[in-house]
């Protein structure tokens, strides 16, 4: 973390008890746009990686349904027949997804720092992610790849250390957070960004909403691309378990462990400045998806988001 970020966060913390949230939120947003957006743009220019808004992302949309592929263990219970159905729709994987043999149409991943206790990133995780990208570069050469969180960590981050094989069809996105401690504050923040067209359908954009985890970004991308249905697969969040830890199906990666498996996934746990993903999804459904006429579903009920998010009708997998 840079000295500038530390100073700004210290200042914001000192203002928390003195400023109303609506004003604090605006100060934080303007600072983030000025500092982190500029840093993301500078990194893109320095490395010669195009920004996402140079690409007409609407050209990727073939269907009205987007399947989002997460890394929870329920992925391993999806039948071959269902995978055949999923393959007939547009798909977006994120973060650890390349460990899976199914290659999606889009792939989102974070420009993680080399090591950061605050970001829950260890040096081991960084090395594992980089090796994963190298091993899967050929399979993902024609996949549209979007790297996020570029403006947060500055020099000590993945975008400056990407394998050259990973550069084809790679784009930089700027992730826009809000500052919120409660559902009410999050609602205010999302309404603020909504007025700034962060959830408006568009052919070109590079500003992506993100709060609590990558799932919020991909849901917002689905809305902006004009999908009518978004189906979440492997978004379990019950424990810190991943599909690639199955010893029978994934013997090469089964020993990987980035946190105690018995603990709930960190995105499902509330923190001082981060409400749980269940609340984030609830607010997004109410404030963004429902007004836009977008339906959100789960592939199965093995998720901390159930029963808030319904299970998709089985007929969708018929092909």
Model-inferred region functions:
Residues 3-319:
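Metal-ion/cofactor- or nucleotide/acyl-coenzyme-handling active-site neighborhoods
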């Amino acid at each position: 973390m840079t000295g500038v970020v530390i100073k700004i966060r210290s200042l914001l913390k000192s203002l928390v008890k003195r400023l109303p949230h609506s004003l604090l939120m605006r100060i934080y947003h303007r600072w983030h746009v000025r500092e982190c957006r500029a840093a993301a743009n500078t990194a893109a220019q320095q490395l010669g990686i195009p920004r996402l808004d140079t690409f007409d992302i609407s050209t990727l949309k073939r269907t009205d349904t987007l399947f989002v592929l997460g890394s929870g263990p329920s992925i391993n219970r999806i039948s071959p027949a269902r995978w055949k159905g999923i393959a007939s729709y547009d798909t977006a994987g994120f973060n650890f997804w390349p460990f899976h043999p199914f290659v999606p149409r889009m792939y989102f991943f974070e420009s993680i720092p080399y090591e950061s206790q605050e970001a829950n990133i260890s040096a081991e995780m960084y090395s594992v992610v980089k090796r994963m990208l190298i091993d899967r570069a050929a399979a993902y050469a024609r996949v549209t790849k979007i790297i996020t969180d570029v403006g947060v960590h500055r020099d000590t981050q993945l975008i400056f250390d990407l394998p050259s094989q990973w550069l084809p069809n790679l784009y930089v996105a700027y992730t826009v957070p809000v500052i919120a401690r409660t559902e009410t504050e999050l609602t205010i923040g999302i309404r603020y960004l909504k007025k700034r067209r962060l959830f408006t359908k568009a052919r070109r954009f590079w500003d992506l909403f993100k709060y609590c985890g990558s799932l919020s970004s991909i849901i917002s991308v689905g809305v902006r691309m004009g999908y009518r249905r978004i189906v979440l697969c492997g978004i379990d969040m019950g424990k810190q378990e991943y599909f690639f830890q199955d010893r029978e199906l994934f013997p090469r990666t089964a020993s990987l462990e980035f946190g105690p498996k018995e603990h709930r996934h960190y995105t499902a746990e509330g923190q001082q400045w981060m409400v749980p993903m269940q609340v984030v999804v609830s607010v997004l459904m109410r404030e963004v998806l429902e007004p836009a006429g977008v339906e959100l579903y789960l592939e199965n009920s093995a998720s901390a988001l159930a029963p808030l998010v319904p299970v998709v009708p089985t007929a969708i997998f018929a092909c």
